[in-house]
Amino acid sequence: MFSRVLIANRGEIAVRVERTLRRLGIESVAVYSDADAGAPHVRAADRAEWIGATPAAQSYLDVEKVIAAAERAGAEAIHPGYGFLSESPELAHACAAAGIVFVGPGPEAMALLGDKVAAKDAAAAAGVPILPGLSGESLTDEEITAWAAGAELPIVLKAAAGGGGKGMRVVSDLVGLPDALVATRREAQGAFGDDRLLAERYLANGARHIEVQVLADSHGNAVHLGERECSLQRRHQKVVEESPSPVVDAELRERMGAAAVALLQSCGYVSAGTVELIAEREDPSAFFFLEVNTRLQVEHPVTEAVTGLDLVELQLRIAAGEELGFGQDEVRMEGHAVEARLYAEDAAHGFLPSTGRVASYREPAGAVGGPGGGEAIRVDSGIEQGSEVGLDYDPMLAKLIAHGPDRRAALAGLRAGLADLVVLGPATNAAYLRALLAWPEVREGAIDTGLIERLGAEVSPPPAAPVLAAVAFSVLLGPPPSDDPWDARDGWRASGPAWARARLAGPEGEVEVAIRAAPAAPPRERSHFCPDTDEKCEREDWDWEIGEDSGTFSFDGQTLAVDGEARELSIYGDGDAVWLLDGAAEPARFEVVEAVGPEGGVAGGGSLEAPMPGVVIDVRAEAGGEVAEGDVLVVLESMKMELSIQSPRDGVVAEVLVAVGEQIARGQNLIALAEPSTEEGTG
């Protein structure tokens, strides 16, 4: 076995490989670009090597830099992870030339199976069913057009060198074929440096994407580890995967597995590999070859969960020349596992990528990293609080995997894990995934590759409730200091609580909010909020108004009650903003744009109060001076804005209770006002 291995990747897969290396007592070497200096995968490694600037072409995709880093670190092997150079024959050749072991198949098998035309021919030769279509070394547009004219529509165009959903176009009519050919060739050239295409029948009435995990060693041993159902996709990319498939029985599993093993053995394949199949939705026994992934798959954890095996460990042992050590009859699949991919994307707007700093990150309670966690939620993550999510790399942030005794339990566990997950900052698809997993077709296993597209916005999580803006404002106002109503910082006064008003920016745009401590709730029953802690907080009751909406809510930092209905609500501070999470909707971030003073009136005893916490930056009143209604008496800096406190009536300043520079709390007395003198001079 190796003593030191370099991981030619980043993010969650690098962290996941590092876990296995650590368990095996193997030193790990991370690589990083400028953007990833200090990233979790770098800190988790025993050693790290810088390989270039942020763009992947200048770092993670640069074979020479990766090899040089391995040589500097004295690494005996390179594990490529997935993506980047994981299916690069060039890297495999370079490793061989440098005397470094590539943890994966040989370059010849990789090149053969990485070419869709050659792979399809190999599949047919090995007896794997293939879809009717047209393939050749260099098909012209004219050849494809002529074939399509006599084919059953729709058809799909695919990049011969492609994979991962890139370089694909579905063509439903011949009129759109010329434009589709141009666009697909352009995308194929840009993504793979190769514009060759193939064309084949497209299963228009819905298809299942089912793949088989295979392991093959250099001693002629090969086994399959069952199948994974990967039909829940958007833009031809997987979102949710599971094992086993809800529609594959033991007989079909053996047929699919035998076909996959036969194909890889016929190509001299050694390592972990995945044979992807496409099947009829209603009759999965009618399956066809799709492609081969010559690397570890993103969704490998579901196979690890049901088999109890560590696929990274097996990859390493095979690469070190060891035998598998078990046969097909020893492979056992226990229970059911489901994985959800957490993407930095806006599900409500076409799954567009999202960027930003991760303001807060919390994994589900009891989560484990890597295989071997039993039925606990497994999280493979490459982010943490403070991570910057940009557009330079894949938007996948993490994966959540749930394992249960059956499919129903696994789905329920995954939904619970997603509800307990906190990722604030860039938009993510977490709430969307929860809604998707609860959808009837998904619960019943009646899924296909077109389901997400057909559902569209139907499955979108609900928008944030209007009252959340009022709750956020109450949190931003800060806590009252004591049980003394005369010292309360909540706007309470003998004549009734005052309204605090502000304009907040939230997920639905800007909104004007007014709140006041509910008159029915004495101040002594209210306490402080506890954002970012697990402490139990006491209840606060508030009246609220937003446009034509109004009501009363109660909140204790964990449970929000509105009109008698209670739900869990979490608070996370983010500088001068606050995040609210209710488990169903997307996280909602609120920030005060403009603070507005309270309605007229003075506190008990004739004191003018602060509507918000802040710092006194100007005092314009003097003791004994007369003031008129509307005169500015004190100026506060609150929430990065200036707030002028005006006299609510004519009067005389009895006492100035604050000074410039003083930090004051919400509801604190600022100026004591007396009635204006009514005595007339005697002359």
Where are the language model's segments positioned?
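N-terminal beta-alpha lobe that positions the nucleotide/phosphoryl donor
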Residues: 1-275, 279-300
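Short, well-ordered beta-strand elements within core beta-sheets of diverse protein domains
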Residues: 168-170, 201, 248, 396-405, ...
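Catalytic cores of soluble metabolic enzymes centered on carboxylation/carboxyl-transfer
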Residues: 260, 301-549, 632, 662, ...
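Catalytic P-loop NTP-binding/switch module of NTPases
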Residues: 566-610
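Residue-level signal for inorganic ion chemistry
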Residues: 46, 78, 213, 436, ...
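Conserved nucleotide-binding/hydrolysis modules and their immediate coupling elements
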Residues: 541-568
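Short amphipathic alpha-helical segments
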Residues: 3, 166, 244, 394-400, ...
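Structured functional modules or segments
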Residues: 598-683
